[in-house]
Design a protein with these regions (language model features):
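Periplasmic polypeptide-binding modules associated with outer-membrane biogenesis and secretion
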Residues: 34-241, 271-282, 441
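Transmembrane beta-barrel outer-membrane domains
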Residues: 200, 215, 243-247, 277-281, ...
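Repeated loop/turn-to-beta-strand initiation elements of outer-membrane beta-barrel proteins
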Residues: 205, 230-233, 260-266, 293-299, ...
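Transmembrane beta-barrel strands of outer-membrane/channel proteins
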Residues: 209, 235-239, 266-272, 286, ...
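Outer-membrane beta-barrel "beta-signal"
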Residues: 254, 523-532, 551-563
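Residue-level signature of outer-membrane beta-barrel architecture
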Residues: 256-258, 290, 332-334, 376-380, ...
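Transmembrane beta-barrel wall of Gram-negative outer-membrane proteins
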Residues: 267, 277-378
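C-terminal outer-membrane beta-barrel translocator/porin domains of Gram-negative envelope proteins
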Residues: 354-504, 508-510, 547-549, 557-562
Length: 563
């Protein structure tokens, strides 16, 4: 049964916190169909939320205490023994007889003493524990007798109840541990259930195991180590906007853990330019996910709009537009160990863009797309933090999307495109935290001319830095970012982080076209506490296309406050 109260039994596992950096992912963004930086913010917000939740799984459910490799068994004492005729097992359904024989055969002899029998039972218990069945136990069916087989019964056990020590927590044990009741206790399933709960910022839970009231039964107690408010907010300001839309930007993100009591999560984000002019860029997005065992279903919706004046020789006209995006994704945990998460994801997206210039509709810059995407994501902690995603996207003609056969020219962007993308990030910290290095590589390739919504943005704060006015995006491209930081503690709450960065990029619009190279540099400092962070950077372009303005370098300021 599922319950919400229990006495605290003995603890079966320990956890340790791994210091990890939430690496911001580089994502493909649109071009003239909408403000590219607004689209970048919407995509990046969703991917950052997903990454932070995956990081919490590893931080809050770290590895078991390391165990030394078993040495050679000590010499057996001289004691009475039984002349047994082989070993007979009963009750083994979870581990094959061949595996059991391979483990126990070296311990068998014609004369089995009490010490040797105990070694055999211990080895059998360890074999089940290594396979994740931590509540299984073997015992002798009867007293050994000369001339008889050694009879061993394996009680593989079952989960009798799953109980919550804090009944006021708004979580669902049934959704976190589906199908576990009545089945043998499997450590991987237990850890996965805890992972699904601990991915929420406000929860930090652990599990204890106690004997049940029925023979072979086990009671699981889920209890909190710490807890926080389920509602959170992040307010931020930055001046990384463009001159033609507005320099100053503000953003607000609200999060709510388990609003329906189903271990779900919802985030609402909005951003807007703050300059009081006729130009603006605004975006709003909604992200929701709900887990069930090893699966997670996610929904997202976003809307962005922009407007800015364009000065012509004889008059000033207005460019404006909007983009709507909706997506449904299904994520499956494929593999997990103490420092690795491997996830597979399928996503179906609908994207609609409308662009106008001087009140005239721009059909080519207003694609309607339906996109299916499959990806694999690997998050691994070893000597540093590795985060990589490999994806394939295919444009479809579903749900009212544009059709390739309706294009006026084969050279125009394809709605039924093919696109491959790889993102690899590595973060490493020096001894005693004296330095940290963050390296990010993003690659995108498509054999087709891509719509603006699917092109890769190469010049941005999260791509090649130093290009505030000049936007470069293409169907094919690569970006390699590197940042070296020297964090220093100031007292007990403050951290000062000087840093320097160097980025390079390469782009090619279509196969056969001439490539374009980019390079930019960054030097800055960050000051942070637990709840807020201030970043000040000087960015400068080193190499790239002819600039649209005479801005050789610029200062970037960003302030964020977590409530």
């Amino acid at each position: 049964m599922y319950s919400r109260h229990c006495n605290i039994p003995y603890q079966i596992r320990t956890s340790w916190m791994l210091t990890a950096l939430a690496i911001v992912l580089i994502a493909p963004t649109p071009t003239l169909a909408a403000d590219p930086r607004a689209q970048e913010l919407e995509r990046r917000t969703r991917e950052q939320l997903e990454l932070e939740q995956r990081l919490r799984l590893l931080e809050r459910s770290g590895p078991l205490s390391p165990q030394a490799a078993p040495g050679p068994p000590p010499p057996l004492p001289v004691e009475p023994c039984w002349q047994v005729r082989g070993l007979r097992l009963q009750g083994n359904t979870l581990i094959s007889l061949a595996q059991i024989n391979a483990r126990l055969q070296p311990l068998m002899s014609d004369c089995m003493s009490v010490t040797r029998i105990n070694q055999l039972l211990t080895a059998l218990t360890a074999l089940y524990a290594d396979a994740g069945f931590i509540a299984s136990r073997p015992y002798l069916a009867q007293r050994p007798q000369d001339g008889q087989s050694l009879d061993v019964i394996i009680e593989e056990g079952f989960v009798e109840s799953i109980e919550l020590a804090a009944p006021d927590l708004p979580i669902s044990l049934r959704g976190a541990f589906p199908g576990m009741l009545g089945k043998p206790l499997q450590l991987r399933e237990l850890e996965q259930g805890l992972d699904q709960l601990n991915r929420l910022r406000s929860l930090d839970l652990t599990a204890d195991v106690a004997p049940g009231s029925l023979p072979g039964g086990s009671r699981l107690l889920i209890r909190p180590r710490t807890s926080a408010a389920p509602i959170g907010a992040v307010v931020s300001y930055n001046n990384r906007g463009t001159e033609y839309i507005g320099r100053n930007n503000g953003a607000l993100t609200l999060t709510y853990d388990s609003p329906l009591g189903l271990n779900d999560f919802v985030a609402l984000s909005t951003s807007t330019t703050l300059d009081q002019t006729s130009a603006y860029s605004r975006s709003q997005s909604l992200y929701y996910n709900i887990p069930y065992g090893f699966w997670t279903l996610a929904l997202s919706a976003g809307h962005s709009q922009y407007r800015y004046p364009v000065e012509l020789p004889s008059q000033t006209v207005r460019a404006n537009g909007q983009t709507r995006q909706y997506s449904l994704s299904l994520n499956r945990l494929l593999w997990r160990d103490q420092g690795t998460l491997l996830n597979g994801m399928l996503r179906l997206s609908s994207k609609r863009s409308q662009s106008y210039f001087a009140d005239q509709y721009l059909a080519i810059q207003s694609p309607s797309l339906t996109v299916a995407e499959a990806s694999l994501s690997l998050l691994k902690i070893s000597d540093g933090l590795w985060n990589s995603t490999f994806s394939y996207a295919q444009g479809l003609d579903w749900l009212g999307a544009d059709r390739d056969e309706e294009r006026l020219s084969p050279a125009l962007p394809r709605a039924q495109f093919r696109k491959y993308r790889a993102d690899v990030s590595y973060w490493r910290q020096g001894r005693d935290g004296q330095w940290s290095w963050n390296s990010q590589l993003a690659l995108q390739y498509s054999p087709d001319p891509l719509p603006s919504l699917e092109q890769m943005l190469l010049t941005d704060d999260y791509a090649v830095r130093g290009f505030r006015q000049d936007l470069v995006q293409a169907a094919n491209g690569a970006v390699w970012r590197n940042t070296l930081s020297l964090p220093r503690r100031l007292g007990t709450q403050w951290t000062l982080s000087p840093r320097v960065g160097l980025d390079v990029g390469w782009s090619k619009q279509v196969t056969g076209a001439e490539g374009q190279r980019l390079a930019g540099a960054n030097i800055g400092v960050g000051l942070s506490t637990r709840d807020w962070q201030l970043d000040l950077d000087y960015q400068r372009r080193l190499y790239g296309p002819p600039p649209s303005s005479h801005e050789p370098g610029f200062w970037r300021l960003e302030l964020s406050l977590q409530i």
